Amino acid sequence: MGTNLSVPNPLGFFPDHQLDPAFGANSTNPDWDFNPIKDHWPQANQVGVGAFGPGHSPPHGGVLGWSPQAQGILTTVPTVPPTASTNRQSGRQPTPISPPLRDSHPQAMQWNSTALHQALQDPRVRGLYFPAGGSSSGTLNPVPNTASHISSISSRTGDPALNMENITSGFLGPLLVLQAGFFLLTRILTIPQSLDSWWTSLNFLGGSPVCLGQNSQYPTSNHSPTSCPPICPGYRWMCLRRFIIFLFILLLCLIFLLVLLDYQGMLPVCPLIPGSTTTSTGPCKTCTTPAQGNSMFPSCCCTKPTDGNCTCIPIPSSWAFAKYLWEWASVRFSWLSLLVPFVQWFVGLSPTVWLSVIWMMWYWGPSLYNIVSPFIPLLPIFFCLWVYI
């Protein structure tokens, strides 16, 4: 046993791996492995305890070597404490005892209460501790702080923390306004198309709108009259309808603004004098009739001056322009005055008015909604004008 040099053992996991020629074994140096506790071949057939537990490595040590730890033998070696240093000069020296105050600061011992009181009587010393008009009795006034504001700023150790709540609100406010404005803009741009569809649907009652330009000399594909391509003959009519719709929307906004300004009393229009069709706002020397009532704006002379005199009538604080239009229309069309008692009587019958409104909304509601729905995006704009003007 152990003399056959042809036993293959390239990895060295089996005992007597020093016999493998791959590891330099020969007849002159058969034992190049100096492992003192290596096992021979008969004992290699037994299950040994190695670094990985029973049966996982050969008895002679395994891949971790032949140390006691590789053989599964754990030995606890006590640690040796370091020796105490006997050289006291290498470490920190002890703090020496402070000498007495009379030895270290002899000049401080010469001041007693009597000497200090006498020194304070000197005007030069007194000026250092007491400001002008001060008293030596009681506590000493501190020296005023003459440090500049710049030095106080430079003495700070860091910048103050930023108020993130103010910064967030400052960013979210404009962002929400921008988002709401963009949403309203996209909705407003759909108004002309919706009104155009309603306008063209009046020509195709009971059927789907179809562009009539398809039967012309240059036919196009089937499309709606509200989305004609530029090559379609109906494209010019579509642009004309959109332009008229834009003018109508602009006129509607101006009317609403005019009504709002008139309600706020910002249109100082002189009312008409009953029985008179001529008015003048020229200069007047005196007024034959004093102005009555409280008004936001001053009174104006509304009758034609005679010898420099005129009749003064106060401008209404609200609905001045509407009253002027009503008086002007009543003078031009006398039959309008006959409608006033009927309107007052009808408005006074509140249950009847509400029942009539409910009946009309129930009967014409779907049709009115189809007509009014394109103008719904304008309601937020009207509301903002009403609130902020």
Curated annotation (Swiss-Prot):
Pfam families given for it?
vMSA (PF00695)
Where is the segment annotated Disordered?
A: 79-103
Q: Where is the lipid attached (N-myristoyl glycine)?
A: 2
Per its UniProt record, what InterPro entries does this chain match? HBV_HBSAG (IPR000349)
Q: Residues annotated as region Pre-S1?
A: 2-108
- Tell me where it mainly resides: virion
Q: Which residues lie on this side of the membrane: Virion surface?
A: 2-170, 264-337, 388-389
Q: Where in the cell is it found?
A: Virion membrane
> Which positions are glycosylated?
309
Q: Where are the transmembrane segments?
A: 171-191, 243-263, 338-358, 365-387
Which biotechnological use is given in the entry?
Systematic vaccination of individuals at risk of exposure to the virus has been the main method of controlling the morbidity and mortality associated with hepatitis B. The first hepatitis B vaccine was manufactured by the purification and inactivation of HBsAg obtained from the plasma of chronic hepatitis B virus carriers. The vaccine is now produced by recombinant DNA techniques and expression of the S isoform in yeast cells. The pre-S region do not seem to induce strong enough antigenic response.
Annotated region (Pre-S), positions in chain? 2-163
After translation, the protein is modified as follows: Isoform M is N-terminally acetylated by host at a ratio of 90%, and N-glycosylated by host at the pre-S2 region.
**Cystines in this chain:** none
As for what it does, the entry says:
The large envelope protein exists in two topological conformations, one which is termed 'external' or Le-HBsAg and the other 'internal' or Li-HBsAg. In its external conformation the protein attaches the virus to cell receptors and thereby initiating infection. This interaction determines the species specificity and liver tropism. This attachment induces virion internalization predominantly through caveolin-mediated endocytosis. The large envelope protein also assures fusion between virion membrane and endosomal membrane. The middle envelope protein plays an important role in the budding of the virion. It is involved in the induction of budding in a nucleocapsid independent way. In this process the majority of envelope proteins bud to form subviral lipoprotein particles of 22 nm of diameter that do not contain a nucleocapsid.
Entry's family note: Belongs to the orthohepadnavirus major surface antigen family.
What name does this protein carry? Large envelope protein
Protein's organism = Hepatitis B virus genotype A1 subtype adw2 (isolate South Africa/84/2001)
